[in-house]
From Swiss-Prot:
The modification N-acetylmethionine is found at residue 1. The modification Deamidated glutamine is found at residues 6, 50, 90. Residues 1-63 are annotated as: Required for complex formation with BFSP1 and BFSP2. It comes from Tapirus indicus (Asiatic tapir). Coiled coil: none annotated. It is found in: Cytoplasm; Nucleus. InterPro entries: A-crystallin/Hsp20_dom, Alpha-crystallin/HSP_16, Alpha-crystallin/sHSP_animal, Alpha-crystallin_N, HSP20-like_chaperone. This is Alpha-crystallin A chain. The gene is CRYAA.
Length: 173
């Protein structure tokens, strides 16, 4: 029995016009016209699909920044309202959970749910954490860092999500 072995460079996503795995972060996002064209979707393998014209902000991928003065998480949650989001800090982790019940859209009914967990640096001041949702659906979780040697205040608590009326100033990478 012959088994085809693919080189690792073949499996990497080298750009928006190269194939990506079926079960990547875009799974369940809906279909585009090019997803239905058989010559594009099965050119390489039936388990690969083209992810054309997708941007980082449309993908739900988060961005974590940690510099000398602060720690910031940017997360695209454009399909959720502040009431659908729960943000809480437990020990050294921040947990962001989003869920909305089934609702109707242009193509039928849809429900969404996600759960993200991030480790907080040990020097983040947990008493001064904040979380806001911009008008364009970008969730920003941030907290200042304290100088080393001071207590960062570790405990479990919920962080309220405030709504901003202006779009996010997060970079699009």
């Amino acid at each position: 029995m012959d088994i085809a072995i693919q080189h690792p460079w073949f499996k990497r996503t080298l750009g928006p016009f190269y194939p990506s795995r079926l079960f990547d972060q875009f799974f369940g996002e809906g279909l585009f016209e090019y997803d239905l064209l058989p010559f594009l979707s099965s050119t390489i393998s039936p388990y690969y699909r083209q992810s054309l014209f997708r941007t980082v902000l449309d993908s739900g991928i988060s961005e974590v920044r940690s510099d000398r003065d602060k720690f910031v998480i940017f997360l695209d949650v454009k399909h959720f309202s502040p009431e659908d989001l729960t943000v809480k800090v437990q020990e050294d982790f921040v947990e962001i959970h989003g869920k909305h019940n089934e609702r109707q859209d242009d193509h039928g009914y849809i429900s969404r749910e996600f759960h993200r967990r991030y480790r907080l640096p040990s020097n983040v001041d947990q008493t001064a954490l904040s979380c806001s949702l911009s008008a364009d659906g970008m969730l920003t979780f941030s907290g200042p860092k304290v100088p080393s040697g001071l207590d960062a205040g570790h405990s479990e608590r919920a962080i309220p999500v405030s709504r901003e009326e202006k779009p996010s100033s997060a970079p699009s990478s």
